[in-house]
C-alpha cells in the first residue's frame, strides 16, 4: 500500500536534514557561539567588513556593543 513508502521517506528526510544542522552547529562552535554570516550582496559584505574593523581583534564574529566602542 501507499503507507509502505513512509519509512523510506522518513529516513531520506532525516539524511537530508542532518548535514544542514551539523554545519550550523560546527559554525556556531567554531565562531564563538554565533552562526556563520554569509554575504551574498555587496552591502552585506560591507557590514561584515565594518564589524571586523570595529571588533578590534580583526574578526567579524566578535561583536562589540555601542557602549564598548571607543
UniProtKB/Swiss-Prot annotation:
Keywords: Electron transport, Membrane, Mitochondrion, Mitochondrion inner membrane, Respiratory chain, Transmembrane, Transmembrane helix, Transport. It comes from the Eukaryota. It is found in: Mitochondrion inner membrane. Coiled coil: none annotated. Signal peptide: none annotated. The chain crosses the membrane at residues 1-21. GO terms for cellular component: mitochondrial inner membrane; mitochondrion; respiratory chain complex I. It is a single-pass membrane protein. Complex I is composed of 45 different subunits. Accessory subunit of the mitochondrial membrane respiratory chain NADH dehydrogenase (Complex I), that is believed not to be involved in catalysis. Complex I functions in the transfer of electrons from NADH to the respiratory chain. The immediate electron acceptor for the enzyme is believed to be ubiquinone. Belongs to the complex I NDUFA1 subunit family. This is NADH dehydrogenase [ubiquinone] 1 alpha subcomplex subunit 1. It comes from Bos taurus (Bovine). The lineage of its organism: Eukaryota, Metazoa, Chordata, Craniata, Vertebrata. The gene is NDUFA1.
Amino acid at each position: 500500500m501507499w503507507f509502505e513508502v513512509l519509512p523510506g521517506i522518513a529516513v531520506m528526510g532525516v539524511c537530508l536534514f542532518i548535514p544542514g544542522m551539523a554545519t550550523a552547529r560546527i559554525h556556531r562552535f567554531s565562531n564563538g557561539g554565533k552562526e556563520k554570516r554569509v554575504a551574498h550582496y555587496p552591502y552585506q559584505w560591507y557590514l561584515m567588513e565594518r564589524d571586523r574593523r570595529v571588533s578590534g581583534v580583526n574578526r567579524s564574529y566578535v561583536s562589540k556593543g555601542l557602549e564598548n566602542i571607543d
